[in-house]
Amino acid sequence: MKALLDLFKQVQQEEIFDAIKIGLASPDKIRSWSFGEVKKPETINYRTFKPERDGLFCAKIFGPIKDYECLCGKYKRLKHRGVICEKCGVEVTLAKVRRERMGHIELASPVAHIWFLKSLPSRLGMVLDMTLRDIERVLYFEAYVVIDPGMTPLKARQIMTEEDYYNKVEEYGDEFRAEMGAEGVRELLRSINIDEQVETLRTELKNTGSEAKIKKYAKRLKVLEAFQRSGIKPDWMILEVLPVLPPELRPLVPLDGGRFATSDLNDLYRRVINRNNRLKRLLELKAPEIIVRNEKRMLQEAVDSLLDNGRRGKAMTGANKRPLKSLADMIKGKGGRFRQNLLGKRVDYSGRSVIVVGPTLKLHQCGLPKLMALELFKPFIFNKLEVMGVATTIKAAKKEVENQTPVVWDILEEVIREHPVMLNRAPTLHRLGIQAFEPVLIEGKAIQLHPLVCAAFNADFDGDQMAVHVPLSLEAQMEARTLMLASNNVLFPANGDPSIVPSQDIVLGLYYATREAINGKGEGLSFTGVSEVIRAYENKEVELASRVNVRITEMVRNEDTSEGAPQFVPKISLYATTVGRAILSEILPPGLPFSVLNKPLKKKEISRLINTAFRKCGLRATVVFADQLMQSGFRLATRAGISICVDDMLVPTQKETIVGDAAKKVKEYDRQYMSGLVTAQERYNNVVDIWSATSEAVGKAMMEQLSTEPVIDRDGNETRQESFNSIYMMADSGARGSAVQIRQLAGMRGLMAKPDGSIIETPITANFREGLNVLQYFISTHGARKGLADTALKTANSGYLTRRLVDVTQDLVVVEDDCGTSNGVAMKALVEGGEVVEALRDRILGRVAASDVVNPETQETLYEAGALLDETAVEDIERLGIDEVRVRTALTCETRYGLCASCYGRDLGRGSLVNVGEAVGVIAAQSIGEPGTQLTMRTFHIGGAASRAAVASSVEAKSNGTVRFTASMRYVTNAKGEQIVISRSGEALITDDIGRERERHKIPYGATLLQLDGAAIKAGTQLATWDPLTRPIITEYGGTVKFENVEEGVTVAKQIDDVTGLSTLVVIDVKRRGSQAAKSVRPQVKLLDANGDEVKIPGTEHAVQIGFQVGALITVKDGQQVQVGEVLARIPTESQKTRDITGGLPRVAELFEARSPKDAGILAEVTGTVSFGKDTKGKQRLVITDLEGNQHEFLIAKEKQVLVHDGQVVNKGEMIVDGPADPHDILRLQGIEALSRYIVDEVQDVYRLQGVKINDKHIEVIVRQMLRRVQIVDNGDTRFIPGEQVERSDMLDENDRMIAEDKRPATYDNILLGITKASLSTDSFISAASFQETTRVLTEAAIMGKRDDLRGLKENVIVGRLIPAGTGLAFHKARKAKEQSDRERFDQIAAEEAFEFGTPSAPAEEPQHPAE
């Protein structure tokens, strides 16, 4: 019987839909939803607890309280289903209809919807072309608005006060109509003829020239056209009927003690109904206008509060002075419907517990406590018990399980076999934060986790908790097993490195076992095989680190690949190795040579080893190998018995002398400062430099002492060998600690920074072993506290960055195999400061070649365009010395609404070409966001110890070759015969014999060149030197100095050093100059020749002018003779703050938000010749004359540093004024490729500084999403408006349609949007609304009558469909294909029938299913 009853309760099949449309509801629509009008404010009768009739919980309107039972109890049971009781008027049906049925309130006077009024920009204002202020005055009964001016000189939509109105009425009588309140506004809205307005606006747009007007008209046109298209009437923005939410969604719950807990909405609705009823009565009584007006205003306010409390005026508050939660508050923000309930659901069949280490598990297993498993797998156990006949009913089975009879445990074992569970550790920052494992039942209450997966989960065992989830359906189990099993996820999706790398004790054990010692016990013995070595070791005849000769059997790939031949064949060779390494060779997988183990295994080496194993031996062998490495590591670490004590921290003997020398040097600088040879700033810079160098020196001495130890070799001579000091071994192996930390233990702590980032010039000379005195301890607390405060901030910021990144990329999925484009970007090795920071091989690995890769010597094609470049390919390319390869990239992919596999390349987490359906957008966002917490908020390192690199003051060549200067390098020779650089962007290249570039160095302005163009040099030769602490201003011409505008007290100040009494002239800041006149002048030097005439720039009429920047110390006197290349002034560089202006996270966020930097550098808009025009006040005028002879002017603030000189030819997009680059300019002037290179390099710089590896393609994916909108320049015959921003795919589709119809397509400019902006401007309103600014997004979407095609992942999660990625993409594709074939079959049948009966067949319309 129970089963029968359930039949009636079953939910009817959910309708299938492909899109969701949002719009404004007309009053009739609202009435059609409603099941009755709510007339009374009463809720329930508090004596009988029954709902009041016609009240907010009325059973007649909303449905019965109990299933199949009317209110008065006349009809009960199923047999009366659908009957409406004549006594109480309640329909007999399920009680759950109270969640679906709506009511309505007929408003006595229309009311404006606050969202369309107050959500900026005000939509009502746009449609009516009135200001928000005016509309508000009309709505809240402070002013009249003219509706129909008739024959009077008044204008429609004119605002007039009450006084005005009465005067006009006396003057014109009833010739004109003016109203106040929502009725007036509704009249105005009704009187708008949309078609006519759209026509006028379009013509106005074509004819007007003013920017402001174009913007205004375009906005208004967009809204009106949306009304036109969607068929929504503007007057629906004014409500006549108010819908009432179903009562179960705003429940009223009786608490014990006769009180009630209620949803705030009920209070808000009660207020509306009360005021509405009072207004009805007043209108019936024909009350005085002023009373009615006041009541109408109060009604308007009540409805405002219901819809969005606090949006206008004071928020309505409940009894406890707390603002009531309105409908808008229900859906927005972190606790709102979208983020709390739709995107973050709690799930059944899950549990959480503390994790402990499980070293005995296999990689794909986890230990699950028995009691947890019993609870999680309950339904499966019930089923099994029934099937086996242990229990007859589910109830009996339940009892069995509760009593935990022995049979239950046996069945549990059976149930969980082959049934994976998913483990998740919060925060889940990337894909590897959830992995599937096969459960192994264990006693106790903690989950056991395999040590090697800790790195992926970022878990440790200091009390971390993890959650377990059970995949229920067969499909879910299959996906968990094939896609999520831990042993299938051995690579990080961020960079393709192995994620199952050993750490800590495992590393220490392996390192200890593979070290070699001189003169160990049994050194020089020879063994016939590994088993002999093991026997000797077990009998203590040899030590682990002794050098011995062993015959080792390796399994190598078989050359003979014929049918039936074994894949691997044994190969025996004699190796000189150590006992430990020989023993480890037992676990080598077939296919790996012994040479990979024949070295001390540090952490990096082990990682490389596992990587090699993965590439050569495949996934299964690697997983087994990693497991065995782990077992060996733990065993060996235990046997090694490494521990540390105070005496292990050796304080270097030279420390005293090094520190003493430094103190002497500092004293010397103090003396120079006192006698006025250096400025205070220079002194500070130098002192800080000395101490950081000292800190380094002590550290170095300490490491040298720690890292080697004396030892007697076999011949009895003393030599040194690498130390077996425990602390040193821990750091050297990479198990724990770093050189910097050891330096603080046994060297000196060094310089500390104040909270503002400036460095305290007195260092802490003590270390932790000697102990700090009170003052030193006090100084060091600064840095330590700041570190803690930073960490807390950092986590939140990093999480927010990840959220924005995921939001902008969530709809990017691989949807096809190849888009067929031949575009790509040229990849080169990344060189910085002459060093190769990232080799070409790392940048192109796993990419698809965009054009053929050609051997430079033989010109034959090595790899064709479209080939995936794997490890062997990049090794070939590197070996042949090819220095540039064009590869496909996500940025140039031509797939619409997605990406193609070829443009993306290798899926780094799997090591093969990416599959169709992979959600590469989300993976990119996770890869960039996950290491976010490791980035700094500013640059802050070890315990606040200031780690400022001593500033570079020279460059030297790293390799042999020939010096070449770039075209922009210019220099002059001064009187001493030195070559002084006067170009700002010159670079020196070192090329090898074939002319290939080996390294490249920037040579700064004012440097002295030591090698000239064409010089052949050896590695280590200095190319140029310069003073790192000041920046000079140098003259390119000789002559007599003549100062202009150098007036003491006006533009320059005499700085007399308090200590030394010497004076220098310093240029003072414009803002600090007194008179207005002085603000516009710029102190400068002109040069006079022997005749007293101004020296001119050769070939022009311009006199030489050399301007001084603010802060420059002028080093020449008026009338002094100067030679070419002499220094006129020096600008001290900024005081040494800790490196990096905006470093770390804020910098990454700044780049992805595409913010224009303040004081950005200026790029040349065109290619042409530079000249300087007439200066205006405070600005200098720079003119570029392009090739056609047109002039382009730039006004540049005087204090800016101009990088070009008169007569120089610049290319479009070249930097002409120094400063940080503006990404928008780069995109506009240099194109997408340059922009992508800029953003990728800048983001990578930040991560590289922290030693985080992220593949470039992830950043490119984000950049693609930032470029996904374009701005229409000329709309052609399309439906777009010039200046409108539209989705790129949308515009390309429209253009294709135009070309197909022989019409004019639109032209467009690329625009760059920051990630927040891009997320909000996505076509999917559901996704945008769930991100930020919910109200604004929904308001706009409703007016536009937007349709969401559910393309992204987020929208689909929210509406509860399978996401269109991974297996879900296949599902949707199959469903669409089936619908298509069904439709065709249906059409065919219809056509046949029509043919039989001879009726003309109507064309079948495509059924779209927008769910309203």
Curated annotation (Swiss-Prot):
Q: Which domain of life does the UniProt lineage start with?
A: Bacteria
Which residues are listed for Zn(2+) 1 binding in this entry? C70, C72, C85, C88
Gene Ontology cellular-component terms listed: DNA-directed RNA polymerase complex
What Gene3D superfamilies does this protein map onto? 1.10.132.30, 1.10.150.390, 1.10.1790.20, 1.10.40.90, 2.40.40.20, 2.40.50.100, RNA polymerase II, clamp domain, RNA polymerase Rpb1, domain 3
Gene Ontology biological process terms in this record: DNA-templated transcription
Annotated Mg(2+) binding sites: D460, D462, D464
Cofactor binding remark: Binds 1 Mg(2+) ion per subunit. Binds 2 Zn(2+) ions per subunit.
Annotated stretches, region: Disordered: 1393-1412
User: Might you give the EC number(s) for this enzyme?
Assistant: 2.7.7.6
Q: One Pfam family name from the record?
A: RNA_pol_Rpb1_4
| SUPFAM superfamilies found in the cross-reference section | beta and beta-prime subunits of DNA dependent RNA-polymerase
The catalytic activity, as recorded, is: RNA(n) + a ribonucleoside 5'-triphosphate = RNA(n+1) + diphosphate
**Protein's UniProt keywords contain Magnesium:** yes
Molecular function via GO = DNA binding; DNA-directed RNA polymerase activity; magnesium ion binding; zinc ion binding
Q: Which cofactor names does the annotation list?
A: Mg(2+); Zn(2+)
Q: Which residues bind Zn(2+) 2?
A: C819, C893, C900, C903
- Family membership, please give it: Belongs to the RNA polymerase beta' chain family.
Q: How does it assemble?
A: The RNAP catalytic core consists of 2 alpha, 1 beta, 1 beta' and 1 omega subunit. When a sigma factor is associated with the core the holoenzyme is formed, which can initiate transcription.
- Protein name stated in the entry: DNA-directed RNA polymerase subunit beta'
- Organism of this sequence: Burkholderia pseudomallei (strain K96243)
* Gene it is expressed from: rpoC
